[in-house]
Amino acid sequence: MGKGKNKMHEPKNGRPQRGANGHSSRQNHRRMEMKYDNSEKMKFPVKLAMWDFDHCDPKRCSGKKLERLGLIKSLRVGQKFQGIVVSPNGKGVVCPDDLEIVEQHGASVVECSWARLEEVPFNKIGGKHERLLPYLVAANQVNYGRPWRLNCVEALAACFAIVGRMDWASELLSHFSWGMGFLELNKELLEIYQQCTDCDSVKRAEEEWLQKLEKETQERKSRAKEEDIWMMGNINRRGNGSQSDTSESEENSEQSDLEGNNQCIEYDSLGNAIRIDNMKSREAQSEESEDEESGSKENGEPLSYDPLGNLIR
């Protein structure tokens, strides 16, 4: 082989280099893949960032998916963020007054597991504008229906929705099959927060909403108790029970009467019922008639009596 014969050179005319078999070279394929990946990355109107602690499954992590799409940037521990930092370590809640900060500097989140918050070095991350999120319900596949258990994309979307940028919230959530369900699930509550101004007003709205939920829960419990009491004290059921008792007693009495009557009944050879008391009375009558006949005659001869009624033979 000659020296440098297998060395790959960049074509001068800009066309993809082909091998002896007419196919493009492997190096050209790699170059095209990198170009395709860069073209697929999206841009968001404001800066998005996260501190990723690899607590979640990469296939189900919403933050990692946003990173693959090129929508969010991963920060190192020790780096600070100038925009809104949605963090469990925040002091106040996100409010509509934060709109200017969001539009100028963006928003960031902490990508970690709710069960491993104690492992997160909050003193080494964050920024000047750390915020909590008010009461909202998760719609993601892991914590659906659970309050405050939002994942990364839900937290960012909630921040944008509260400050009034529903378009940004919808754009982020559109990359997830369940994403728009988050806005539908919290529609009424987000509209309430959007009508507030500062952090205190959002906090009051949150407390009023929680009191409303508590009241509805107590009402449901009281209604359930009343329904249980009504079922236990149903008059119709009691009446049916007494009627059944009386009917049973009547049946028992009738059965006892029949049994008593059966004791006085016998059957002849043809299966006809014969009452014993009637039979006995008939036998007694026949015996009396026989006695009378025997009294009127004895051995075919008439009987005579003295004046005192004694039989004279």
From Swiss-Prot:
Compartment(s) where it occurs, according to its Swiss-Prot or TrEMBL record? Cytoplasm; Nucleus
**Residue pairs linked by disulfide bridges in the UniProt entry:** none
- At which residues is Phosphoserine found? 286, 289
**Annotated Gene Ontology cellular component terms:** cytoplasm; nucleus; peroxisome
Region annotated Disordered, chain positions: 1-30, 215-313
Might you name a Gene Ontology BP term for this protein? maturation of SSU-rRNA
Give the consequence of mutating residue 111 to A: Reduced aminocarboxypropyltransferase activity
Q: What does this protein do?
A: Aminocarboxypropyltransferase that catalyzes the aminocarboxypropyl transfer on pseudouridine at position 1191 (Psi1191) in 18S rRNA. It constitutes the last step in biosynthesis of the hypermodified N1-methyl-N3-(3-amino-3-carboxypropyl) pseudouridine (m1acp3-Psi) conserved in eukaryotic 18S rRNA. Required for processing 35S pre-rRNA at site D.
Further comment: Present with 3610 molecules/cell in log phase SD medium.
- This chain belongs to the protein called 18S rRNA aminocarboxypropyltransferase
> Native species of this protein?
Saccharomyces cerevisiae (strain ATCC 204508 / S288c) (Baker's yeast)
Q: Which gene encodes it?
A: TSR3
